Amino acid sequence: MAKADFYETLGVSKTADEKELKSAFRKLAMKFHPDKNPDDADSERKFKEINEAYETLKDPQKRAAYDRFGHAAFENGGMGGGGMGGGGFANGGFSDIFEDIFGEMMGGGRARRSSGGRERGADLRYNMEITLEEAFAGKTAQIRVPTSITCDVCSGSGAKPGTQPKTCATCQGSGRVRAAQGFFSVERTCPTCHGRGQTISDPCGKCHGQGRVTEERSLSVNIPSGIEDGTRIRLQGEGEAGMRGGPAGDLYIFLSVRPHEFFQRDGADLYCTVPISMTTAALGGTFDVTTLDGTKSRVTVPEGTQPGKQFRLKGKGMPVLRSAQTGDLYIQIQIETPQKLSKRQRELLQEFEQLSSKENNPESTGFFARMKEFFDG
């Protein structure tokens, strides 16, 4: 079967410069790389063709020979390279772009590669809902969290008591192996030890070689007074157990404060809308409000109070987290219009309306006068 034209393989013209070649190679190598197409023979074949084409065309001498003689330039030892031969990494190859293209795909470079050593346990998340009263006073909550803990039979080794894990013979304990892919040397997780660097011939009967078991733990969580909705509490070392002696992860408690029936919160301040009767608003009066600390606070309503009027109860809001300060409670007045009037009530209101003057309702009287003047000019 005749070889495909190198320029066609990379999808570039015969006048393509080095930048165009490199760009085309990056795109195709990422698309057909074996790590992204496991067990795909066609992709592997295409990947090798791309490598060979780029290796040839990026080298000025090889490209000149190819342009003149085609594939024949590299047959029977011509040019001392081509295919799987002389070029490669020894001549710079494409190691200059290897890490750039595949570094992230391979786990982000050497710093991220498993060495078969200690491995930190995973962090855990626990969602907790509390009441506004609990956020006000603070509390100690008991929670139960399913998590992975170190096996108490094998002490986390994964091996049956009296035995020890052995260094993996395939990767020599590194957890990684290298395999040739065309001009590339590709690093993968060791298929024998699955990245652990160790093998266990006689696994622990309780954890089955994992070194960890799943259990439900009871934990005490301290919720300070003044905590806000959406706050995250970190319990260090209370996440999943580490592997092979690695440190445990952390447990994060995500708090949500349940909406309250009467109070709305804004930072450390509380707001409460209180409906009062029309007569109380007109004549004045008092009412009591029960605050979150359980005490009652009396609010005095002056006569002539209008809808939306706010009264401030200083220091009756929420405590400020880790502070001696406290917010305020704001009472907003809502005037309730009477409904289902009796005949006598209706008569009295009609009589009241007849006795009313502009001074009794300055806002409404002034509003309609201003509107009339505005539109009538």
From Swiss-Prot:
Q: What SUPFAM superfamilies does the record point to?
A: Chaperone J-domain, DnaJ/Hsp40 cysteine-rich domain, HSP40/DnaJ peptide-binding domain
**Alphabetically ordered keywords of this record:** Chaperone, Cytoplasm, DNA replication, Metal-binding, Repeat, Stress response, Zinc, Zinc-finger
Tell me which species this is from: Agrobacterium fabrum (strain C58 / ATCC 33970) (Agrobacterium tumefaciens (strain C58))
Q: Which GO biological process entries does UniProt record here? A: chaperone cofactor-dependent protein refolding; DNA replication; protein refolding; response to heat
- The record's CXXCXGXG motif repeats, renumbered to this chain, cover 151-158, 168-175, 190-197, 204-211
The name of this protein is: Chaperone protein DnaJ
- The organism's lineage? Bacteria, Pseudomonadati, Pseudomonadota, Alphaproteobacteria, Hyphomicrobiales
Entries under CDD domains matching the protein: DnaJ, DnaJ_C, DnaJ_zf
Biological role stated in the UniProt entry: Participates actively in the response to hyperosmotic and heat shock by preventing the aggregation of stress-denatured proteins and by disaggregating proteins, also in an autonomous, DnaK-independent fashion. Unfolded proteins bind initially to DnaJ; upon interaction with the DnaJ-bound protein, DnaK hydrolyzes its bound ATP, resulting in the formation of a stable complex. GrpE releases ADP from DnaK; ATP binding to DnaK triggers the release of the substrate protein, thus completing the reaction cycle.
**Which gene produces this protein?**
dnaJ
J domain location is: 5-70
Which cofactor(s) does the record list? Zn(2+)
The molecular function terms in GO held by this entry are:
ATP binding; heat shock protein binding; unfolded protein binding; zinc ion binding
Q: Which family does it belong to?
A: Belongs to the DnaJ family.
